[in-house]
Amino acid sequence: MAVKTLKDLLDEGVDGRHVIVRSDFNVPLNDDREITDKGRIIASLPTLKALSEGGAKVIVMAHLGRPKGEVNEKYSLAPVAEALSDELGQYVALAADVVGEDAHERANGLTEGDILLLENVRFDPRETSKDEAERTAFAQELAALAADNGAFVSDGFGVVHRAQTSVYDIAKLLPHYAGGLVETEISVLEKIAESPEAPYVVVLGGSKVSDKIGVIEALAAKADKIIVGGGMCYTFLAAQGHNVQQSLLQEEMKETCTDLLARFGDKIVLPVDLVAASEFNKDAEKQIVDLDSIPEGWMSLDIGPESVKNFGEVLSTAKTIFWNGPMGVFEFAAFSEGTRGIAQAIIDATAGNDAFSVVGGGDSAASVRVLGLNEDGFSHISTGGGASLEYLEGKELPGVAILAQ
């Protein structure tokens, strides 16, 4: 896709220019509002550093959570401003609003190399409005912060599948460029979508089958094997006639799973054993069981060791691997071994078989960090779960398509 990039903007010169950057800082916070995974913040740094060092007056936009169009302190970007200041080694100011008086005063007062973070763009209901006129009005107010000779850099890959004001509409009003992160993400996904080296193995987990139907349909023609674990595997197992007891089940998707197994049964690889739990609790009683031996009233929260071994054998010969979604409830240590085992098998294939491996953002990327695995063991860890899935499904990403215009 022919889009102008950050390099093009830097070549044109940014010294003294206001540059508005859309980043993805939708990071997890604990009850004390401390960031528990800085992955997305770390990924944003190269673009912000390059602009700051080039002398730009940088204004950063981002959202956090779903504040539903109103100011809610719980979703303030204050922890992000603090983390950015620490990681960049320079003070990043946080505006008290998005396009209000404080944002304008601070934007006007920026000097070369300064970085200003606007408050959560979703505090303004127009950010996610379905009304184009409302979004356009908000985009005009955002663009006004850049004064004359401004520019827009799209660097939040985790949001490019959303046609929202700070991602899409603002790009119509300012010269626009793909940031380094978005450029890298698209080139990686293009490689997987257009010319994956065989054998190509896709690993899908996560809770809902309904979220992954499109990607299974799209990738079944290209992938050699599709490994299915996580919460979504229980609907497949139920479709095969297994009693999954209280495990996560999308009853309304059983027929769809039956159809997928009928069409792609030679490619879909399912677990052969499970880790059952007496309840959904980190301290629950647990036991390793075969597919029809989950005790009555219990639920499965992870794939079992034989499944890890089987999946590992499939992955060991792969030359291209795309992984999206954990194999179990990795947040509970007792039910994290399936995810750890699959991640390690992917790392081993990357090193030992020279496979090109992509972790498709979201919970899979979080699990790599939570479990303390070597992030450098994968070829690429994406920052966008939903965006990467939609791209591989063949859907247009509005926030990328607009950059080509």
Curated annotation (Swiss-Prot):
Q: What is its main location?
A: cytoplasm
Where in or outside the cell it occurs: the entry states: Cytoplasm
In the record, what terms sit under GO molecular function?
Answer: ADP binding; ATP binding; phosphoglycerate kinase activity
User: What CDD domains does its record include?
Assistant: Phosphoglycerate_kinase
Keyword set, alphabetical order = ATP-binding, Cytoplasm, Glycolysis, Kinase, Nucleotide-binding, Transferase
**A cellular-component GO term for this protein:** cytosol
GO biological process terms held by the UniProt record:
gluconeogenesis; glycolytic process
Q: Which pathway does the record list?
A: Carbohydrate degradation; glycolysis; pyruvate from D-glyceraldehyde 3-phosphate: step 2/5
Superkingdom, taxonomy of origin: Bacteria
What this protein catalyses is: (2R)-3-phosphoglycerate + ATP = (2R)-3-phospho-glyceroyl phosphate + ADP
* Residues noted as binding ATP in the record, renumbered to the chain: K212, E331, G361, G362, D363, S364
Matches recorded under PROSITE patterns: PGLYCERATE_KINASE (PS00111)
Under SUPFAM superfamilies, the record lists: Phosphoglycerate kinase
EC number assigned by the record: 2.7.2.3
Residues that bind substrate, according to the entry?
D24, F25, N26, R40, H63, L64, G65, R66, R122, R162
The record's annotation in InterPro entries points to: Phosphoglycerate_kinase (IPR001576), Phosphoglycerate_kinase_CS (IPR015911), Phosphoglycerate_kinase_N (IPR015824), Phosphoglycerate_kinase_sf (IPR036043)
Q: How does it assemble?
A: Monomer.
Q: Family assignment?
A: Belongs to the phosphoglycerate kinase family.
Question: What is this protein's record name?
Answer: Phosphoglycerate kinase
